[in-house]
Regions:
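Alpha-helical segment of the N-proximal tetratricopeptide repeat
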Residues: 56-96, 100-109
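J-domain helical core
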Residues: 1-15, 24-47
């Protein structure tokens, strides 16, 4: 790359329009500049390619993460957390490990600790829709519905097609007895994902609370068919 820079400087000085305004020099100068930029970008790309996967994700961190995932599959959440921690010792900014650790803690109903994991993710990546959604779920489990709604708002602003966030938002509104808003959320969730059985069931619950029994029955029937 050093030789390319030197050659570029020589040619640029030779054909620069300010130095020699002869016909065609401006065009040649532009061609030289364009060629240099192309070579420079190609060199940068080559440098990026030479970075090994193991430089970004050390082998021991990946191994610990994979062991944690295997334990999650067996529902051994306590042991899985130990291995997620090992992965995070080596890679403190490993977003997915923080999310999966938070999920394991949530399954153990350790919601406050899970919240800490999702906060870590949001420090690393404030636009993580999964972290906003899961943080909202934890807050909802802790009956902090207003705070949970703020999280679901963020998730759906970042991704309006996040049907799970719309569903959980509906659950919060239902618990706050804001039935019309809850119904709107479940409607959005089922429009985005028509085979979302949970949202159909939840929509039925809202309609039943609103004394719309026939409509509620249709939703329950829809949910039942989808679960078969």
């Amino acid at each position: 790359m050093k030789e390319i820079k030197q050659a570029y400087r020589k040619l640029a000085l030779l054909y620069h329009p300010d130095k020699d305004s002869s016909d065609g020099n401006e065009t040649r100068f532009k061609q030289i500049s364009d060629a240099y930029q192309t070579l420079r970008l190609h060199h940068k790309t080559e440098l990026k390619i030479t970075i090994k996967f193991t430089d970004l994700y050390p082998e021991d961190a990946v191994s610990s993460y994979e062991q944690a995932e295997a334990l999650i599959a067996k529902q051994n959440y306590e042991e899985a957390i130990v291995f997620y921690d090992k992965a995070l010792e080596r890679l403190p900014r490993y977003e997915n490990a923080w999310i999966k650790k938070g999920d394991a803690l949530s399954r153990l109903k350790r919601y406050e600790e899970a919240l800490g994991c999702y906060e870590k993710v949001l420090q690393i990546n404030p636009e993580s829709t999964d972290a906003w959604n899961l943080k909202g779920v934890c807050l909802s489990e802790l009956k902090k519905y207003d705070e949970a709604l703020e999280c679901f708002d963020e998730a759906t602003l970042l991704n309006p097609m996040h049907y799970a966030a719309w569903n959980f938002m509906g659950v919060c509104f239902f618990n706050l007895r804001k039935l019309e808003k809850a119904l709107e959320c479940f409607d959005k969730a089922t429009k985005i994902k028509p085979d979302f059985a949970v949202a159909w069931h939840n929509k039925g619950g809202v309609l039943l609370r609103m004394n719309k029994k026939k409509e509620a029955e249709k939703c329950y029937e829809k949910a039942k068919k989808l679960r078969q």
